[in-house]
Amino acid sequence: MPKRTDIQSILILGAGPIVIGQACEFDYSGAQACKALREEGYRVILVNSNPATIMTDPEMADATYIEPIQWEVVRKIIEKERPDAVLPTMGGQTALNCALDLEKHGVLAEFGVEMIGATADAIDKAEDRSRFDKAMKSIGLECPRADTAKTMEEAYKVLDMVGFPCIIRPSFTMGGTGGGIAYNKEEFEEICRRGLDLSPTNELLIDESLIGWKEYEMEVVRDKADNCIIVCSIENFDPMGIHTGDSITVAPAQTLTDKEYQLMRNASLAVLREIGVETGGSNVQFGINPKDGRMVIIEMNPRVSRSSALASKATGFPIAKIAAKLAVGFTLDELQNDITGGATPASFEPTIDYVVTKIPRFNFEKFAGANDRLTTQMKSVGEVMAIGRNQQESLHKALRGLEVGATGFDEMVDLDAPDALTKIRHELKEAGAERIWYIADAFRAGMSVDGVFNLTNIDRWFLVQIEELVKLEEQVKAGGFAGLTEEVLRQMKRKGFSDARLSKLLGVAESEIRRLRDQFDIHPVYKRVDTCAAEFSSDTAYMYSSYDEECEANPTDKDKIMVLGGGPNRIGQGIEFDYCCVHASLALREDGYETIMVNCNPETVSTDYDTSDRLYFEPVTLEDVLSIARVEKPKGVIVQYGGQTPLKLARALEAAGVPIIGTSPDAIDRAEDRERFQAAVERLGLLQPQNATVTAMEQAVEKSREIGFPLVVRPSYVLGGRAMEIVYDEQDLRRYFNEAVSVSNESPVLLDRFLDDATEVDIDAICDGERVVIGGIMEHIEQAGVHSGDSACSLPAYTLSQEIQDKMREQVEKLAFELGVRGLMNTQFAVKDNEVYLIEVNPRAARTVPFVSKATGAPLAKIAARVMAGQSLESQGFTKEIIPPYYSVKEVVLPFNKFPGVDPLLGPEMRSTGEVMGVGATFAEAYAKAELGCGSVYPEGGRALLSVREGDKQRVVDLASKLVKLGYQLDATHGTAVILGEAGINPRLVNKVHEGRPHILDRIKNNEYTYIVNTAAGRQAIEDSKVLRRGALAEKVNYTTTLNAAFATCMSHTADAKASVTSVQELHAKVKASLEA
């Protein structure tokens, strides 16, 4: 069936901000869907609140709404745009839930909008646990013994049937939010109560435990003529009991017999037919009991998922793009496979002649007090994928691509320590983020494969692979550098050992290993991902390295520019940097360069095979990048766009003769190196907070007496404020040195005077050597001391005077010329008592670039990429700052609900995972939209609790009177109540937890509050008030930990976030009109 002609316009629902469990794989699927549908001539309308996405670029859809993904807001968009159909399968759980809401509230019927890609009934059947179980039984498939419960009473009834241990999951949530494994009554009670609260339908599914079973996934695509193909089978290295998003996974499945594979394949197809997924991609999960082979079906997702992004990258088969076309009526045999240049139709099942490994990336170090053991609730923040010719090579490449400091199977434990074995056994039994390394240590300590299997339930086949690598390491160590013959070295490289790992094992420099490889002429060749195991030739340059015989790279002799990506997502380095890399590639392609992308993150648009001319799916390490440069010989390499990952390589790449374009590595170092930067600042006569660099604790104490407290302390060279703290006295400072950092001459610690209550400002600018143009001035809403990545901000500034802004503009220009910036630069200032203090300068793409580009309509990353390639700003027509005639607010999304036990107080360490944007005619409206976009719904009135620190007591009176005007009744803790009483506002007095009951926590648990404002300073005060913030989070009460944000919230109460919707295209037309005027 060719495409449908009875629909002309289609609304695509996006996934919103990046949260744990739902990351940038949905930007990848959404961007593909937009492209695919417009290719077929449909008018595409998109809604997504996340500005850091490629899909929300104005050229991706006909009308783009960066608005909250809430049914009332989407109703406004439907009313205005009148789409014929809505496609909800591209935006994860957020989009599915929103589509079901639109259906439930009659919006789709009211405007005659058809749901395509999945029906409301199919979504409900797959998501509603009891319906799903019934459906599976009807086709003869077994599900785990389970039942649903809507109350604690029902939960205990189910428990009698399934017994301990049992797995508890709330319905309609994603990433396993609120779920867990209960081994006893107490845990059962706690997890069930939390789950009932978090499920939008207040329903739990309680399953028998399949812990230790093998877990598999099938990625299936079906069209309306009932053609079905399996795109890819995926095997979880980690057994059941660990969320698949937190498991190491391997494709294709390695340990299934052919018979088991066929059974599973047939079962998957039966599931899709039964659930009624007429078109598109779905993911079906199975569990197999290794003892007796019993197979059960765990769940299915009737949408594009994290696994389908992985399967697309693993096979080269673009699931989202194909799914979008199937949704409008095409069948698989009518669609061509792009990778083979149309030689094969999309109905050919991909075959692969390599092994793919995915390893999740965790950020537990950011969440002190979090439980870092892996369970059924997803906790990873990103992932890395690697391709190799065998399992060992694939695994090794993934380990070094993770960027956690591992060069391979590095040792975790000192085996001579008396408790070494105890530690290893604990880490194997209670899986944490580093279990894979402890497995290697177990073999080093003499444990057997069976011994490790009994503790981990990881299939013995995988364990044998790791054991063999450990044995090889021992042999190489024993043979020494002299024993590294051509044959031995080639064998090690074929098994994926990195030069860095070999150099560590042999105690020589990494460059020595590289020299030896040159001498023996041992270099990687590049193979193509072609969907067909080389049966047909492929024009698509999608490459991975291996130490095989034949190279398929076939480089051209065009002018090329290579862009280095950011590797796996992590907090502090996420989708914003990928956005910049994609823009660099797009801009330079338009200018006739051949672009080469190097990255290893399977979720992103940058690793899509048609984003760049050539894609190398490789770890972003020195060795891997140099090998690619050796084959491709690029004219220039861009390291400033992928965050800290490529930036760390800049100097070494330059030393190896690789041409870095844009700001030079030396200029980058001048901005990052404390002493060199200070010299530049002094030469320009700019103000900086007093600071010092120290290499020992006593020296720090001495300096602190000169500078004075509070101080910001942090190690030098970090991204996302890792290990950064504000200390308030000498005792606090000593504790920091003893607990938080290891300080030495190589790794000094920086001390800065902390400007309490200052307003922080972020400025993005571009310099081409002749002129500097400001991209945008963003005023932070949270005051200084909250990491810039965790602060909301407004463009244009909403309180700063023109005079102060001009002062900053002047300073940015001076700095850009002084540092010799070519391309993007980000500068941070703090404003206090009408003085401008320079905090830092980053001569690279910052995480604010996508937001500024959406707010002003100027594609900064593209403009700057062209500057790096030699074009001037004037020749591109970008010569003056754009100040839009409306307000844009960026607000962040924090993952505290995934980490019970962590204090949600904002501070200098970045912990947000994503962002949303709100736009309005006034600051109040923009802020209200941003708050709605990240899920904060502020009720009108109710009771507010105020408990603030000493430094905020002057301003709290003003805040209290604003809240009273808005209809709130007030409660306050003792110190705050006294101040308010003196000003004639009489709040109800409440007890702190140690002052007797009923205390604050009791009142929070009784749902007495609709809003809480709590600010704290100093180690002790923060510790004491932590229960209040945790309580607010647990009971879902809106709370603010800075006064500035509380004032902004009061302002936003005066605006209606759901009143009007405006597309990005309309906004940018307003900018254009105001520029022409």
Swiss-Prot record:
Residue numbers binding ATP 1: R129, R169, G175, G176, E208, L210, E215, G241, I242, H243, Q285, E299
Name of the protein in its database record: Carbamoyl phosphate synthase large chain
Keyword Transmembrane helix: no
Biological process annotations from GO: 'de novo' UMP biosynthetic process; glutamine metabolic process; L-arginine biosynthetic process
Sequence segments annotated as region (Carbamoyl phosphate synthetic domain): 554-935
Binding of Mn(2+) 4, residues: E840, N842
CC cofactor note: Binds 4 Mg(2+) or Mn(2+) ions per subunit.
Region spans: Allosteric domain: 936-1077
Region listing for Carboxyphosphate synthetic domain, in residue ranges: 1-403
